[in-house]
Amino acid sequence: MKRKQDSKGAGSRGQGAGEKKQGAGGRGQGEKKQKKSPVPSPQSPVPDPDEWLQIGKIVSAQGLSGEVRVYPDSDFPERFEVPGTRWLLRPGQTEPQPIELLHGRYLENKNLYVLQLAGVENRTQSEELRGCMLFVPASDRPELGEDEYHVVDLIGMEVFLQTSGDLVGTVVDVIPAGNDLLEVSLHEPVPSDKKPKTVLIPFVKAIAPVVDLETRRIEITPPPGLLELGSGV
């Protein structure tokens, strides 16, 4: 089974999975006066934040011509390579603003994209965007194939033993690996001064044969010892 990630909402979950999984040489700007970054005013109309999908974070400038490096929180390359409107959220703000993606490319071996955003024409402007998050509307979520799931849909699902129906715990994260791993917070009382125990469960059909998004239920058939292996406090 495969997980696909477009992180949802303005708050970022730990980005190791992020829908998770570009050289540059820019033009010098000489003595030209630097422009401000073209981020629209906070009065621009925006959708409800709960309906946004986070797709990446701007981590640095690239070259001198205004390109930015983006760490992807999405498994869909078209988020970064197909021109069109994206939504940008500055640190400290609560509403993202529309900005146009002109073009983008992938940086091999770095897990980064290089994007050119409309109106960002020099390194000063691109440096001002460091730390900004990129979003698309949740209505733009791509259709997935059989046995593919969005990470945001898996988070919070309850996990049960298929044989007994006993509750194992709740999915709190999805960790990318050769086979993705569900990080499950075990359903058991713990002292108030201790963190809940968690366990990593391979997200493969042999171990997680039932994934029911409507009932928010995952049924597992773990091999002996799996639920104890790697658990901690």
From Swiss-Prot:
The keyword Transport does not apply. Transmembrane segments: none annotated. Its main location: cytoplasm. Keywords: Chaperone, Cytoplasm, Ribosome biogenesis, rRNA processing. Residues 145-226 form the PRC barrel domain. An accessory protein needed during the final step in the assembly of 30S ribosomal subunit, possibly for assembly of the head region. Essential for efficient processing of 16S rRNA. May be needed both before and after RbfA during the maturation of 16S rRNA. It has affinity for free ribosomal 30S subunits but not for 70S ribosomes. This is Ribosome maturation factor RimM. It comes from Trichormus variabilis (strain ATCC 29413 / PCC 7937) (Anabaena variabilis).
